[in-house]
Amino acid sequence: MSKTEENKYEFGLMLPERYQNGIYLFNQSVPTVDEGLNGTVPEKIRRFNNAASHLVRSILTVEQVYIEGIPILQLCQDVDSVYDNTYRQLIRNVYMELFVYQEKLLNIVCNIFFLEIKKSKQKNLVGLRKRSASFPLLCEFCEQCNQLVQDDKYKRVMSIRDDETHNMSQIDSFVLDLEKTEEGLRIVNKGYRIKAETLRAEYVYAMEKLLQIRNLVQEMLTMYDLRDIYTKLKEQGEEIWVN
């Protein structure tokens, strides 16, 4: 895959210049050195980008295998070929990493707006929306997240991911039928329930949606100074929480 193609997958966040000199804390007063260093903006973004790199690596790997394997898929008649099986395993990794990336995006926005991170995504979004009165970009972020969770195509991707974690794989599921033979009935494998091309189209769709949200998070980091966020939240009477 060329460098130009790799640049399509800019899932990481850039550190704004204002945070590059000295230690700039998410927290305004930290009780220990360790918590202070882990609370710096560069460290938060480094950890986010590290998580994003897992997704990028998964995508680049599966795309390379896809390009190399198109002729194999066209020639192979085996419904459970080694190539197809391997490709599906790699796609599964992408689906898993998309979910992790979605969580990381929401978490870093909670960091930026000093909101305690809950286990429920919906509770986090409700908390962020409460804080969005003075921050139009945060309001837009909440709207995009709500649209995403209601998007049928995106929900399908997350449904497939959920089934993978609960040992009910849709990716590895076959269409089976019964066929009469002279010896009696036998089970016939008619191929995978979901075609590899469909799985690929769905994760590409989800990836593009998440990139739109990532771009908005980058804009928030660039446009909003954490000191201003802190001051406005205090004025609104919001509780300040450092994750």
What are these regions (language model features)?
Residues M1-R57, N85-Q89, N107, I117-N243:
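Acidic, Ser/Thr/Gly/Pro-rich intrinsically disordered interaction regions
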Residues R46-L75:
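Extended, loop-rich substrate-binding clefts of extracytoplasmic carbohydrate-active enzymes
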Residues T61-Q64, Q74, D78-K118:
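Amphipathic alpha-helical interface elements
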Residues Y66-G69, L73, L105, I112, ...:
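Leucine-rich amphipathic alpha-helices with coiled-coil/heptad-repeat character
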